[in-house]
Amino acid sequence: MLFSRPGRSIFPLLPPYGAHDPNGGRRIIPLNPDGITPYLGLRSRLSQVWLNRWTILLLLVLARVLIAVAGMQSDMGSAKREALSACTSVESMGSAMVSMPHYLSQGVNELTAAGVEKAVSALKTMLLLTITGVEELILFFIKVMYQTYLCLFTMVVRGSVHLALGVVEDAADFLNSTVKSIGQDIHKSVDSFESSLNSFIDDINGIASALLGEIPKLDISDKLDKLDSLSLPSSIDSTIDKVNNSIPTFDEVDKYVTNILRTPFEEVKRLVNGSLSNYTFDRSALPVPAKEQLSFCDGSDGINSFFDKVAHITTTARTIFIAVLIIAAVLVCVPVGWQEIRRWRTMKERSQLVHKDAHDPMDVVYIVSRPYTAATGVKAASRFSNSRRQILVRWVIAYATSPPALFVLCLALAGLFSCLCQYILLKAVERTVPELTSEVGQFAGKVVDKLQDTSAKWAADANSAIADTNTDLNKNIFGWVNTSTTAVNDTLDAFVEKTTGVLNDTFGDTVLSGPVQEVYDCLIGLKVEAVQKALTWVHDHAHIDFPLLPNDTFSRGAADSISDGSSNPSDSFLADADDQTSNKITEVVFRVTDKIEEGIRTETVISAVILLVWVVNALIGVLRALSLFWSRERTRGEGGGGAPMPAAPADSHGFVDVPLTAIPDVASHSQPAPRYEGPAPALAVSRDIPYGDEKLGSVGQKALHVDGISDLRGSSYVEYGMEKR
């Protein structure tokens, strides 16, 4: 389409000097006689190489990194102060913890002493019950053994005595009755004989009394009366009764034997009651640890070395970033300078396109001003055969790489690169955090070690007191058991050995040796062996051992809280209830790193959003190009391409109207502009452009004015005159 515009000055689009050739030939713009040009030459361009966008962006990245390093150093300084403060708190808490045995031991000592006293009381009760039980069992066993024989013995003895007493009584009664009967019979016979004899004597006395005198009479009545009263003495019965009464009864024997057997057991009970009734554990024998004071924060190499290392890392990183980015900013000037040289040369080469009538002037200006993006578009457009699509591809690339778009892209990339540098610095710092965690673990380990030492020392002293109690009780209570069982076992061994020797000497060479040995084993040997086993068991188990206190009585909980097997890290005695980390000191560092990480994340999101803006802008261009890419090209009647214009020679002032057609210049050997086929050639219409002379300072040059209608090409896909894209 053709548009008319009022006359206007084309200065400074074209230089006033040498702007026309009076001979009407091709224009050759000479240099100023002094070599000065209104545009920048090569040396001027090279003098501004250090102001290229990449150097500036790298310097901006360096500035952001330096700000981040300074912020990290400030945050780490605050973190160091907080960590030292937390360390002091931990130190105070650790001192309180290692002093806890001083307070806890008093209660534990009382608990231990009370436990020993209760155990001794229970031991006394158990011993009394055991002794009573053993006493009754032994009595039962002995009674079973001796009462059988005692019953038989008592029966035999008492039966014999009763039998003898009955015989004596019967004999006495018989003798007494027989003697009296005989005496009476004798008395009767003697009385009869005496009566007869006395009668005879009386007769004799009557005859011979005159001659011989009187013969005495026989009188034995008194003697016979003694015979009537003859009987066995009663002392015989009393003696037998005395013997009978002197034989003990079974109840008396049982009571006597029982008293004999109970005597040692009752004595043992008396000893046990006397030793254990009022037993009191010596509480003064249990130790009380002294208070402890820890000091591992003053001059602590752990925290100071960690933050010194972090400061060294940040300083080193700052130095590295300064060196690398400055070197990169300086080195980038080299390719940029070379780029400027090539761009200058390319501009000089492509500036000749202005004199050619085969190219669009705006395209030429774009190619000259943006050589690299234009070259990229040309290369991408070369994949298409249709000139319309080639132009659309070049337009998309030009749209996506316009100065505003490239500014947004470079800003986003610079922001992402800055975030990357900060991320590298953050990771370098985070790699040192385990060292601090390890050092803090050593703090906890120091507390636990101190607790373990205190607990072990206390346990050793307390266990020594308990061991002394064991020794005392075993000696005073069970010492006689060991001595007596050993003596009885030795006695039984001697008895068995002696008895076996006698049996072997007596029946060793006879056929009765085996039976006698079997009878001995059955009656005596097995019972003696069982008694020896029982005595051995009593000897081995008749002692007391109170359980000892473990060495980690006061340190087990603290040690478990920092062990690797702890299920909940917040159980650590260095952790507060609200902390998410294992202790307060590392939580300070993690808070700083989390803050820095959050800042990096925010900057990354901002840079990504800026990059997304560039992507959206590029997508807009792509979508616009695609809408034209697949649409039908309009004809001239539909508002498409303009009418063909014949070519016109140069006017009298030496200006040549440049046709806006895309006719390739096959005669040109320099082809910096794209070579793609365009529509059919059309002749351009030339119009004379009058201008007037005008003084320009002392040089005397004339300004050039253009009146009338400018020659512009209308296109179905690009209208350069309307700046439509």
From Swiss-Prot:
<comment type="function">
    <text>Involved in cell fusion during mating by stabilizing the plasma membrane fusion event.</text>
</comment>
<keyword id="KW-0325">Glycoprotein</keyword>
<feature type="transmembrane region" description="Helical">
    <location>
        <begin position="54"/>
        <end position="74"/>
    </location>
</feature>
<keyword id="KW-0184">Conjugation</keyword>
<feature type="topological domain" description="Extracellular">
    <location>
        <begin position="418"/>
        <end position="602"/>
    </location>
</feature>
<keyword id="KW-1003">Cell membrane</keyword>
<feature type="glycosylation site" description="N-linked (GlcNAc...) asparagine">
    <location>
        <position position="551"/>
    </location>
</feature>
<feature type="topological domain" description="Extracellular">
    <location>
        <begin position="1"/>
        <end position="53"/>
    </location>
</feature>
<feature type="glycosylation site" description="N-linked (GlcNAc...) asparagine">
    <location>
        <position position="244"/>
    </location>
</feature>
<feature type="glycosylation site" description="N-linked (GlcNAc...) asparagine">
    <location>
        <position position="176"/>
    </location>
</feature>
<comment type="similarity">
    <text>Belongs to the PRM1 family.</text>
</comment>
<feature type="transmembrane region" description="Helical">
    <location>
        <begin position="137"/>
        <end position="157"/>
    </location>
</feature>
<dbReference type="InterPro" id="IPR026777">
    <property type="entry name" value="PRM1"/>
</dbReference>
<feature type="glycosylation site" description="N-linked (GlcNAc...) asparagine">
    <location>
        <position position="482"/>
    </location>
</feature>
<feature type="glycosylation site" description="N-linked (GlcNAc...) asparagine">
    <location>
        <position position="504"/>
    </location>
</feature>
<dbReference type="GO" id="GO:0043332">
    <property type="term" value="C:mating projection tip"/>
</dbReference>
<keyword id="KW-0472">Membrane</keyword>
<feature type="transmembrane region" description="Helical">
    <location>
        <begin position="319"/>
        <end position="339"/>
    </location>
</feature>
<feature type="transmembrane region" description="Helical">
    <location>
        <begin position="395"/>
        <end position="417"/>
    </location>
</feature>
<protein>
    <recommendedName>
        <fullName>Plasma membrane fusion protein prm1</fullName>
    </recommendedName>
</protein>
<dbReference type="GO" id="GO:0005886">
    <property type="term" value="C:plasma membrane"/>
</dbReference>
<feature type="topological domain" description="Extracellular">
    <location>
        <begin position="158"/>
        <end position="318"/>
    </location>
</feature>
<feature type="glycosylation site" description="N-linked (GlcNAc...) asparagine">
    <location>
        <position position="278"/>
    </location>
</feature>
<keyword id="KW-0812">Transmembrane</keyword>
<feature type="topological domain" description="Cytoplasmic">
    <location>
        <begin position="340"/>
        <end position="394"/>
    </location>
</feature>
<feature type="topological domain" description="Cytoplasmic">
    <location>
        <begin position="75"/>
        <end position="136"/>
    </location>
</feature>
<feature type="topological domain" description="Cytoplasmic">
    <location>
        <begin position="624"/>
        <end position="725"/>
    </location>
</feature>
<keyword id="KW-1133">Transmembrane helix</keyword>
<feature type="glycosylation site" description="N-linked (GlcNAc...) asparagine">
    <location>
        <position position="489"/>
    </location>
</feature>
<feature type="transmembrane region" description="Helical">
    <location>
        <begin position="603"/>
        <end position="623"/>
    </location>
</feature>
<feature type="glycosylation site" description="N-linked (GlcNAc...) asparagine">
    <location>
        <position position="273"/>
    </location>
</feature>
<dbReference type="GO" id="GO:0032220">
    <property type="term" value="P:plasma membrane fusion involved in cytogamy"/>
</dbReference>
